[in-house]
Amino acid sequence: MPRVKRGVQARRRHKKILKQAKGYYGARSRVFRVAKQAVIKAGQYQYRDRRQRKRQFRALWIARINAAARINGLSYSRFIAGLKQAAIEIDRKVLADLAVYEKEVFAAIVEKAKVSLA
């Protein structure tokens, strides 16, 4: 059985990792051992943050809706309860967008929520 030399495969594997670590600071972009750890950790951060992004955006939308609802004389929880009673099915993403860019439309929606609460 002939001797197996793995130089080509090792070089290919190293190049792949170092390419992924391009732009990292110092040894993290140059030294294979360090770069490999950095790439693995980066992947863990990516995985975690793809899930956190959804939570963070929802929290941002709620904060914006709350601020706009309070300007119109209603708290966030009462506003959402009013929307449910009025059978208005607009998601928080769209409500937050309306609160920021279409203030008159948002005010009209708040009024409908107030009417359904009364």
From Swiss-Prot:
Gene Ontology MF terms: rRNA binding; structural constituent of ribosome
Which CDD domains does the UniProt entry name for this protein? Ribosomal_L20
Q: Which InterPro entries match?
A: Ribosomal_bL20, RIBOSOMAL_L20_CS, Ribosomal_protein_bL20_C
Q: Which PROSITE patterns does this entry report, sorted A to Z? A: RIBOSOMAL_L20
Q: Quote the SUPFAM superfamilies the UniProt record gives.
A: Ribosomal protein L20 (SSF74731)
Q: Does the keyword Repeat apply?
A: no
Q: State whether keyword RNA-binding applies.
A: yes
| A Pfam family this chain is assigned to | Ribosomal_L20
Q: Which UniProt keywords apply?
A: Ribonucleoprotein, Ribosomal protein, RNA-binding, rRNA-binding
GO BP term (any one): ribosomal large subunit assembly
Which residue ranges traverse the bilayer? none
Q: Got a GO cellular component term for this one?
A: ribonucleoprotein complex
Q: Which cysteines are joined by disulfide bonds?
A: none
PANTHER family from the UniProt entry: 39S RIBOSOMAL PROTEIN L20
User: What does the UniProt record say this protein does?
Assistant: Binds directly to 23S ribosomal RNA and is necessary for the in vitro assembly process of the 50S ribosomal subunit. It is not involved in the protein synthesizing functions of that subunit.
HAMAP family in UniProt: Ribosomal_bL20
Family the entry assigns: Belongs to the bacterial ribosomal protein bL20 family.
Q: What is this protein called?
A: Large ribosomal subunit protein bL20
